[in-house]
């Protein structure tokens, strides 16, 4: 894996880890709490003096090797696993509204969160064990009967149930609705759940491949 050479905080909600690969090239791993995670090679201005959170990251992660990137269940929480001579460190990035970025040791004791926060079901502050948000429903774990039970017990429309209760998000739930011949605002008790289930499974388990669109009506498999 790549080594972390430098940590920056160019914005109060953004952290940039500069990674050096085995071939010597640099790539920025950009973490935006509550929004997105991506890599970039763009040359961007960095603060002259590091913010306190960036200083903590530098102390723990400088020259650490990135060993793994893991998703916590089906939730929008990523765990970046780093390791150096001082031990193992986890950097959790919560990619949902009001999410956070949290540095822990190898036992998940919080070294420093980007922002201290308290919620109804958890607290994020230095010195306590990191607990992710309550686990969301994982559609990969459902069978048709449990799927029907979840859908029939919902008081939301089809799109909101797929997006919220099944944790698919707006875009994926809209695709399932369209493929099953339904509108997102459809009454969940008036749709054919067998067709919705078939469309969901096609999306989750189908062998999808990319396509390159060249001109109107022309495309080829990438």
Q: Where in this protein do the model-derived segments appear?
A:
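Extended, highly charged segments
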Residues: 1-222
């Amino acid at each position: 894996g790549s080594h972390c050479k430098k940590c920056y905080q160019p914005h109060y909600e953004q952290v940039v880890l500069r990674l050096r690969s085995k071939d010597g090239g640099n790539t920025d791993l950009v973490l935006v709490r509550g929004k997105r995670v991506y890599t970039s090679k763009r040359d961007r201005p960095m603060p002259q003096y590091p913010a306190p959170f960036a200083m903590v990251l530098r102390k723990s992660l400088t020259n650490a090797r990135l060993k793994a990137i893991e998703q916590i269940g089906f939730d929008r929480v990523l765990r970046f696993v780093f390791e150096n001579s001082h031990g193992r460190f986890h950097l959790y990035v919560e990619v949902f509204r009001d999410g956070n970025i949290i540095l822990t040791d190898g036992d998940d004791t919080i070294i420093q969160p980007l922002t201290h926060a308290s919620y109804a079901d958890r607290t994020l502050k230095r010195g306590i064990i990191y607990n992710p948000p309550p686990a969301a429903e994982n559609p990969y774990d459902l069978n048709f009967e449990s799927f029907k039970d979840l859908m029939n017990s919902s008081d939301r429309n089809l799109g909101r149930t797929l997006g919220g209760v099944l944790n698919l998000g707006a875009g994926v739930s809209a695709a399932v609705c369209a493929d099953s011949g339904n509108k997102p605002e459809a009454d969940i008790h008036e749709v054919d759940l067998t067709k919705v289930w078939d469309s969901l499974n096609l999306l989750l388990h189908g062998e999808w491949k990319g396509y390159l669109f060249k001109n109107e009506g022309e495309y080829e498999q990438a």
